[in-house]
From Swiss-Prot:
Described function: Probable core component of the endosomal sorting required for transport complex III (ESCRT-III) which is involved in multivesicular bodies (MVBs) formation and sorting of endosomal cargo proteins into MVBs. MVBs contain intraluminal vesicles (ILVs) that are generated by invagination and scission from the limiting membrane of the endosome and mostly are delivered to lysosomes enabling degradation of membrane proteins, such as stimulated growth factor receptors, lysosomal enzymes and lipids. The MVB pathway appears to require the sequential function of ESCRT-O, -I,-II and -III complexes.
Protein source organism: Rattus norvegicus
Residues recorded with modification Phosphoserine: 210
Complexes and interactors: Probable core component of the endosomal sorting required for transport complex III (ESCRT-III). ESCRT-III components are thought to multimerize to form a flat lattice on the perimeter membrane of the endosome. Several assembly forms of ESCRT-III may exist that interact and act sequentially. Self-associates. Interacts with CHMP2A. Interacts with CHMP4A. Interacts with CHMP4B. Interacts with CHMP6. Interacts with VPS4A. Interacts with PDCD6IP; the interaction is direct.
Family: Belongs to the SNF7 family.
Taxonomic classification: Eukaryota, Metazoa, Chordata, Craniata, Vertebrata
Transmembrane parts of this sequence: none
Protein name as it appears in the record: Charged multivesicular body protein 4c
């Protein structure tokens, strides 16, 4: 291999080893964009100036007007080239930014995958199954204990609750009977009943009997009301 070939090969290998980072390349592209934007603004101003000169010398000095138009055309050509260059630089910068973003995403995903792998290395599926079974069994036991506490407690005293209730009803009935038998009846008036009025002439005897029966029922109702009031 010739010395010249070795020289170019060494230059390529050195450039490959010293490849710029994405951040450095992006910074340089942004610097170029700013420089080209300033150049673009300068050319636009020069174009407007030459156009004004051409209009100024149009009728008086055609030679000066033509020179101004020529300069204007050159500046417009340069401006067109700068526009194309800026478009290319913007495209390259956007592509590099996307590549840098994808690289960062891939790197972080790989980092997360390694962390997840390290976590899973300490896990055993059999141990997890055993743990879940233990948790389920303990939950069932806790549920049974809760149900046992919530159930009615039955004391082993040998007494039947139905018999006790029946005996209680008998005692209540006896107390009620005692009250009824010891109840004092209202005093009966000792005076003799008033004499019945003499039967008027023309009034039938059935009418007198009906009035007497109504009077007795009224007295009985009064006695019953007094008895009920005393009992309550």
């Amino acid at each position: 291999m010739s010395k010249l070939g070795k020289f170019f090969k060494g230059s390529r290998s050195s450039r490959a080893r010293a490849a710029p980072s994405a951040q450095e390349a992006l910074a340089r592209l942004r610097e170029i964009e700013e420089m080209m934007a300033k150049k673009q603004e300068y050319l636009e101003n020069r174009i407007q100036r030459e156009l004004a000169l051409a209009k100024k010398h149009g009728s008086q000095n055609k030679r000066a007007a033509l020179q101004a138009l020529k300069r204007k055309k050159r500046f417009e050509k340069q401006l067109t080239q700068i526009d194309g260059t800026l478009s290319t630089i913007e495209f390259q910068r956007e592509a590099l930014e996307n590549s840098h973003t994808n690289t960062e995403v891939l790197r972080n995903m790989g980092f997360a995958a390694k962390a997840m792998k390290a976590v899973h290395e300490n896990m055993d599926l059999n141990k997890i199954d055993d743990l879940m079974q233990d948790i389920t069994e303990q939950q069932d036991i806790a549920q049974e204990i809760s149900e046992a506490f919530s159930q009615r407690v039955q004391f082993a005293d040998g007494f039947d609750e139905d018999e006790l209730l029946a005996e209680l009803e008998e005692l209540e009935q006896e107390e009620l009977n005692k009250k009824m038998t010891s109840m004092e009846l209202p005093n009966v008036p000792s005076s003799s009943l008033p004499a019945q009025p003499s039967r008027k002439a023309g009034v039938p005897s059935s009418v007198h009997r009906s009035r007497a029966a109504s009077s007795r029922r009224a007295e009985e109702d009064d006695d019953f009301k007094q008895l009920a009031a005393w009992a309550t």
